[in-house]
A protein has these predicted regions:
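Intrinsically disordered, low-complexity terminal regions
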Residues: 2-354
Length: 354
């Protein structure tokens, strides 16, 4: 069953049908349709916000507000007439795409005295999937059980909970973005900063980006020219150049390849199975829980090992610019591994201060 409703409202000053609030004119568009549980909702917009709320109804409701401001009423009306939204509506798929006359492009938006924005307010079933594109604006989404494919440039993401394990997020030049929870997926970010409160398994590909995870089960990353923070992480695996990496508590494993940066792991728990680090021009600082049992092999060129732990070296070689250490710490029936290969960097292993 499909229900379709469309209203297009022009508000004009005086009796003509348009209300001008100062030098502002608006156009409103309303659509709603009943959809299937697994429907895909696709929105393509720019120069405005997407405000999306999921609910328990099997219906999608879309309200679009187009606002144009300026000093010349004729130019304002001309601009308003040049902006519209095209729709494709079915129970399986809902598509809304903002259409802006090509003559009113990016240059016009930034340098014309007439300014405009296109804002969407959307309600959709929580089980739907979304494909969202929004540039020069904010995307807000409270909660979604279906897959989220989200792209945002020169804007901001404010996301609540994403329960699918295959979400795809891509954003460039965004700032102060936040996600409360994401079960899994991939994140591609350039020239941005974002925070995630809690996550399952994430694959991160980032350049010139500051990323922060408060709690995450597994993080696989490639991150260059930025900062990566994981306050509490299960498994951390990745590569970085010119990367500052800070980890609070490590619970399972660590595998890193880093050049021209720094690695700081505050606390390696006894549950950690292995730590493998290959680094160049990178200082490494590891906090070791006193109950962690591990065999270690540390191979350094143009660097040295500093430690206040009671390391039991079975082999120790110091020849010219090379330093090599092999041994055991806190022997037990369950032995983990610590392997560090480093060139031009200092390695510090110190006990965690409780």
């Amino acid at each position: 069953m499909k229900f379709f409703k469309h209203s297009l409202i022009f508000l004009f000053l005086l009796g003509s049908g348009t209300i001008i609030q100062g030098q502002e004119r608006i156009k409103k568009i309303h659509k709603e349709i009943e959809v299937n549980k697994g429907a895909l909702i696709e929105i393509d917009n720019s120069f405005g916000d997407l405000n999306i709320t999921s609910w328990d109804q099997d219906k999608v409701v879309i309200d679009v507000l187009i606002t144009v401001k300026g000093r010349n009423s004729k130019k304002i009306q001309k601009k308003l007439n040049s902006i519209d939204v095209s729709f494709l509506l079915s129970p399986e798929k809902v598509v809304a795409e903002t259409k802006i006359n090509e003559g009113w492009g990016l240059t016009w938006f930034f340098f014309s005295s007439e300014k405009y924005r296109i804002d969407y307010t959307i309600k959709l079933p929580k089980t739907n999937s979304v494909d969202l594109t929004n540039d020069y604006g904010t995307i807000r989404l409270n909660r979604l059980e279906g897959k989220a494919n989200i792209s945002c440039d020169f804007g901001k993401l404010i996301i609540g909970e994403l329960f699918a394990d295959n979400n795809i997020l891509a954003f460039d030049y965004t700032s102060n973005s936040s996600i409360e929870y994401i079960k899994g997926g991939t994140i591609t970010a350039d020239f941005s900063d974002f925070e995630i409160e809690k996550a399952g398994e994430i694959e991160l590909n980032a350049d010139y980006t500051n990323a922060s995870f408060n709690s995450i089960e597994t993080l696989i990353f490639k991150n260059d020219f930025g900062k990566l923070i994981a306050n509490n992480v299960g498994a951390l695996k990745g590569t970085g150049d010119y990367l500052t990496l800070k980890c609070g508590v490590l619970n399972k494993l660590l595998s890193l390849d880093n050049e021209f940066g720094s690695i700081n792991i505050k606390q390696i728990q006894p549950s950690v199975e292995s730590v493998i680090i290959n680094a160049e021009y990178t200082d490494i600082k590891l906090g070791i829980d006193k109950n962690w049992s591990f065999d270690y092999e540390i191979d350094l060129e143009y660097g040295d090992l500093s430690s206040s732990l009671a390391l039991d070296h079975s082999i120790m070689k110091k020849i010219s610019f090379q330093n090599y250490f092999k041994g055991t710490f806190n022997p037990s029936n369950t032995i983990s591994t610590l392997n560090i290969t480093s060139e031009f960097g200092i390695v510090k292993l110190n006990p965690v201060i409780q």
